[in-house]
Structure formats: C-alpha cells, structure tokens
Design a protein with these regions (language model features):
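Generic alpha-helix signal with a bias toward terminal, lower-confidence helices
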Residues: 27, 32-35, 45, 51, ...
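Catalytic strand-loop segment that frames the active site of acyl-thioester-processing enzymes
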Residues: 1-67
C-alpha cells in the first residue's frame, strides 16, 4: 500500500451490532462472520495473525464480528458526499486492507488529490487501515 496523503476531511463513527444486523438484512447477507461472535472466532481464520498481532497493542479483539466490506465502502462515499455535497460520481474503486471490527471507532478520511479525484480510507484508533478507495467525480 502506498503512503496515504494528508487528509482534507474526516468523520469518526462506531459501527454497532444493530448496524451490522440491518445491513445484513438490507443486502440479504446472512454470513455469520458479521452476526455470530463464536463463528467469527472459530471459522475462516479469525482470529488470525491480524488479530493476534493487535491483541498485544490493546483490548482483545477475539470473538468479535467483522463489519461488511461494502458497508465500509458506502461509508467512504457518504463521508465524501457530506464534505462535498452535489458531486456526480463517475468511478469508484476500493480495496479492503484489514478487517474492520464492530464496536470500535472507525475514522473515514478523504483527500482531494485533484479537481475531480479524491482518495478515501478508513482507519481504526490504532491507525490500522481497513479500506482504501479512490473516486473520480464532477461538480
């Protein structure tokens, strides 16, 4: 991952269990990794090396649910729209970098890199980047 630019704007939120449940219902995504603590702990490699490494730096993240990637991507776009209302989006690319954990602060950052482009990313309180993205738009 390349170095992130200095942000022009940011917004911090805490994805809750209710948010995950509602997003799962709206998208017909019943994957247990978003809804079931035991499943998140014992299946699909979570907790994996990522969570093991982070456990040394703070409270245990074991047995927690993961935020949907598309929900985080939508939050990137929402924060951009709050900062620059009325944009016409032309292209959006995003990439999940690390799991985003429920009930932990997530800060969405954005940097306007040109007249019609912005780089966006989400990071937790430890500075771990969960997602990066770029948007092309017109005003």
């Amino acid at each position: 991952m390349t170095e992130l630019p200095r942000p022009d704007f940011s917004f911090t939120y805490k994805p809750s269990l209710t948010t995950l449940f509602r997003f799962s219902a709206l998208t017909f995504n019943g994957h247990h990794i978003h809804l079931d603590k035991d499943f998140a702990q014992h299946s699909e490699g979570y907790p994996g090396a990522f969570l093991e490494a982070r456990r040394e730096r703070g409270p245990s993240l074991f047995a927690e649910r993961l935020v949907h990637g598309p929900l985080t991507a939508l939050m990137l776009l929402e924060v951009l729209q709050f900062y620059k209302p009325g944009l016409q989006l032309h292209a959006f690319e995003y990439r999940a970098r690390n799991p985003v954990i429920v009930n932990r602060n997530s800060t969405i950052y954005g940097a306007l890199t040109s007249e019609n482009k912005a780089d966006l990313w989400c990071a937790d309180d430890d500075g771990v980047v969960g997602m990066t993205g770029s948007v092309t738009f017109s005003q």
